[in-house]
Amino acid sequence: MLARMSFALLCACLVATPALAKNKTDFSCTGVFGPDSSEALLIETYGADNVVTGQVPGAEGMEAQATTVFPNDPDKAMQFGWMDNEARQGLGYVDLPPSIDGPHGVHVGMTVAEVLAINGKPFAIGGFWWDYGGYAQIAEGTLANADDATCFLSLRFSPADDYQPDLDTSSVAGEVSIPTDEPLLEKLDTRVSTVSVSFPDVGD
């Protein structure tokens, strides 16, 4: 679990922003999405039949414990990781579903161009097709790191599965940094595949 959590927090630090709660498209790091969240609160909020805790796949073939809400509904499924696995409380991260907008309105399914429009500044994306690929690396703009943020936003991008077989994708594969003006991103129909909000470990 420590490996899964450390990875989630590391990726979150690449794209950090304070969460607001002013309108429909803003996200608030409070309640079930706040640092004091717990499995008990999820059950109270969503119902016991919709909350399942167990092992979930992680990077490099590892598994970690997490709580999934609405596990049988891809449009609503949310995954929660806990700072305290035994008590299942203290939110470490939550992966948001396509039906919920994250901070500043970002959500699963957005194109690179759409995220770029929100950010207002170019950024980079890690190369694809490996365990740690596809994460946004944003240094400037609306979604850039905020030192005083109470929670952190991490975006992961993925290319479409069905692209032209003769397309040379070597420049966007593996441990490389891809600028947002790379034409291949559009040709591959690259979109946000994960919107994750994480919290710092207050014990660090």
Identify the meaning behind each predicted range.
Residues 16-18:
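N-terminal signal peptide c-region/cleavage motif recognized by signal peptidases
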Residues 20-204:
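Short helix/turn-capping signatures at newly exposed starts of structured segments
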Residues 1-7:
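Bacterial N-terminal signal peptides that target proteins for export
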